[in-house]
């Protein structure tokens, strides 16, 4: 029984933290002069809290694992909602495919060049060079 209560507490705490970040993001989105979705701002708040280790990651891990496990199911309503615009999508199918292809190509090129830049060969300079007597 004690183990079950502990598990329930972990899930409750994790979902509460995620929803508090979401609500804070939505409130901040209303105050900002630029249009950024509150859910994105909430994710950024959660990211900052986790990276600065203000919030321990084990506190949100149970709910994150649960949400990731059922992520595909969470996208079903969005897919059904897109079908309302079937006629418009069929009319614009060509430009949609071309823009997806070009944007994917651009992302792949940027990642490739960035990776080559980050992982380029660097000269290793030793702190002291040995002299003839030390060899």
UniProtKB/Swiss-Prot annotation:
Its main location: membrane. GO terms for cellular component: plasma membrane. Keywords: Cell inner membrane, Cell membrane, Membrane, Transmembrane, Transmembrane helix. Belongs to the UPF0299 family. It comes from Yersinia pestis. This is UPF0299 membrane protein YPO1514/y2654/YP_1404. NCBIfam families: PRK01821.1. The keyword Electron transport does not apply.
């Amino acid at each position: 029984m004690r183990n079950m209560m502990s598990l329930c507490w972990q899930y409750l705490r994790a979902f509460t933290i995620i929803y508090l970040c979401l609500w804070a993001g939505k409130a901040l989105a209303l105050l900002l002069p630029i249009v950024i979705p509150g859910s994105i701002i909430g994710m950024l708040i959660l990211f900052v809290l986790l990276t600065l280790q203000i919030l321990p990651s084990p506190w949100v891990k149970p709910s994150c694992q649960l949400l990731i496990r059922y992520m595909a199911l969470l996208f079903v309503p969005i897919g059904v909602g897109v079908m309302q615009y079937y006629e418009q999508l069929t009319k614009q199918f060509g430009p949609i495919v071309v823009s997806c292809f070009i944007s994917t190509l651009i992302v792949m090129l940027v990642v490739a060049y960035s990776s080559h830049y980050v992982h380029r060969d660097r000269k290793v300079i030793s702190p002291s060079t040995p002299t003839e007597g030390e060899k």
